[in-house]
Amino acid sequence: MTAVSAVPLANREPDGVRVAVVDETPTESEVTMRHGRRWAGGAAAALLMVTGLIGAAPSAAAAADAPALTAAVTAKLLSSVELSTAGAERDTRVTVSRSSGRWAFGTAVALAPRQEDAHPTGSIFIARADPAGWRVAFDGEAAFGELAAQSPLVTGPERSALTTAPTPMYAGGDYRTGMALPFAVGQTWTLTGGPHGWGGSAPYSSVDLAGGDQVVRAARAGAAYTMCQGWIRVIHDRGYSTDYYHLWNSISVNGASVGQGAFLGNTGTDVTCGGSATGRHVHFGLRQNSAYVPIAGHDIGKWVLANGAAAYQGGARHGSAWAGVGSGLYNYGALGLTQAVVDANGGGALTRRAGPGTGYGAVGSLADGVTVSVSCSANGTSHTGRYGTTALWDRLSDGSWVSDAYLWTGVNAPINGWC
């Protein structure tokens, strides 16, 4: 079983575009801009059409038209992220890492002010020059997958990762991630900061971790991208992606396929793209469908994150065991999508039975916190656990049955079909 909540993002529109660096011909170029934060109302709709077509009609050498492309990408970036410092100007950094004909691919980052609780925001973009202007899509959007499927710039395993259709937010009430903690399985690191915002505000999408061998690793397989120095994003399946910031010695990647546990860098205090950091750590954030989402309620490394009374508080739960801020989190590895963790709601053992209900004989027990594999589910007697009351029972891979009330599955429904 499981449960949680959500928060929308604000919209802003840029003005006063200033192109600082332009490289029109190579395969990778970077453009930095500065923008005020005046709200332009109706002008925003004119600049950023619902169709995603932005900017003047491109010339034949569309992908080399860096100023128009950069303006289009920047307009979309600043209208889709919440800029946290009122009245401030924000630098943006658009890097075109690949281009060919009418197509361009790269990263767009809104740099953060160098202050506490500030973090950069950004997206991976793909753009196509159409007669009406540049069509720009960001990772996690449905249009991104559509363009990635058509673009000659995206091939092989990367295309598979980028063309996965977005799922409903929080996977439609499904909080399974299939992720390990972002360090080696079997190590214990300290939770130095409980759930908090990527940029200091809601949603509380991120946690801070440090310790062990200080090597930061991919939480799940996917396609990896360098957003800026010290910041890596990995795009996974099921609409999820993960961000890793403040890294030292971070890898330089442009869509490389990485496996779960792949080296991304070391914990550090890097703030190349803004913000601040005290003491080496990794700022680990969870995204879905092009937006940061609350990390609370999701399982990472077989721990279920939970908010506290304020940002940076809270902790995580494995079975009935609780670990608050300052405690160690042991990386149990990824919980499979048809697996569950026993939560006896206070410790002790969970009785296994011969059928879906207490009317069936006991055939053994399971310790709190162990991982089980679910074969199928059926309705039986009703029970109340940590996450509520349910009549659902799960048949385990050994043929025995347990009440779903005492398992964390991430879903309030069968995770492997009905028996």
Residue ranges, per PLM feature:
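Short, well-structured beta-strand-loop connectors
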Residues: V215-Y225, S252-G268
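Surface-exposed, glycine-biased beta-strand/turn segments
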Residues: A148-W231, G315-G348, R353-A354
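Zn2+-dependent peptidoglycan hydrolase active-site motif and core
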Residues: A218-I251, T272-H281, S382-W393
